[in-house]
Amino acid sequence: KDAGIDPSSIRFIEAHGTGTRLGDPIEIDGITKAFAKYTEEKQFCAVGSVKTNFGHLDNAAGLIGLVKAALSLQKKKIPPLAHFNKPNSNIPFKDSPVFPADRLTELGEAGETAEIIRCGVSSFGLSGINCHIVMEEAPVLKKTNYRPKVFHTFEKKRCWIKLPETPYETDMSTVFIKQRLAETPGQVIYG
């Protein structure tokens, strides 16, 4: 509500989803209640958790969920839940806006709908802190004829190859490289 986002544009939720009989129903109930304020539509939003692939990664759990969500938006596909056989019987998915991502789900291409494709990512900390962010697909950029030049510098045992994306980036990269080489002669630079 505060961000002015229509919840029906959220097509995927990367849940904290640790696979517990108590925790998962509570999380899905919270998601259902949040959507219910804005839509009565059922089963339009896939829900998954990368923990089915890796288990709980403790402090990195939220970060890996964020990475999965970003890749899902980029690839326009939601990967299926690994090792998923049947839903938790304590979760009434048929009455919820979410459904388990039990199969590869296409998100569609930009422009197919008037709305921007979004996803949510939830992460719960051991101290009781809950975090939820909403991400959206990157805007479609116009293609240009600009092709970056490959910048090469060969000095003794040093090789730097940089493929800038824009003319501005080319200029800034060159300034940075010259400055860095002057400050750290003989060191290898990674960037």
Question: What function would you assign to each model-found segment?
Answer:
Residues K1-K143, T153, I189:
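Condensing-enzyme catalytic core of the thiolase-fold
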